Amino acid sequence: MNSIHIHTYPRIHFSLIGMSNEGYRINGGAGCSISAPLLDCHFVLSNSLQIIDQREYPMSAKELNKLTQTIESCIKKYELQNIYKCVINSDTLFPHTGFGSNTMIYLSCIEALFILNGLEYTQDDIVINSTRGGTSGVGIHTYFNGGVSIDLGVDNIKEELRPSSLGARSNYPLQLCGFQAPQWTIGIMIPIHVPSITEQQEIDFFRQNTPI
């Protein structure tokens, strides 16, 4: 196998649940996956690791570097021989617009490593090595199973409340339930001319507004 496509679908996140830092658990969330817009990651075996984001509004250089470091850590951990060039495409699914595209990309990149190297793996292997899922489990659970996901967040060990872009915690969100959503027609309006926030703005928002 020399190349693979991994198609992933966005999630709508209804809410984070526990943001007070006073209970036994923090974060937690509810949301569901939707069938469009599609994100396509095309992986082709290569002599060097390359990540090419061809979307109209791509990841920043800092974000691409962070993704590359995550992939390289996984390569080193498992002593993998097959590396790839990854080309990311989507017509309307851009970073930091509320659909979990970065989580989708990270999970896809780790899963592609396992597939192209012929490794047996579990969902936990993908999540742990992706460093995602540190805030809500909606993105990681819907990546694998679609549908609706409700999770209870993580144990409160008095860590900083933060977005998943700051890396995974020592454990990741416990799913309370997951089930297939009704086949509702959902309309989404994406204002093209309104710039999305940056990763740093997202981090700053959490620091300025939590705990609640």
Q: Which residue ranges define each predicted feature?
A:
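ATP-dependent small-molecule kinase catalytic core of the GHMP/sugar-kinase superfamily
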Residues: 2-7, 15-17, 21-29, 122-212
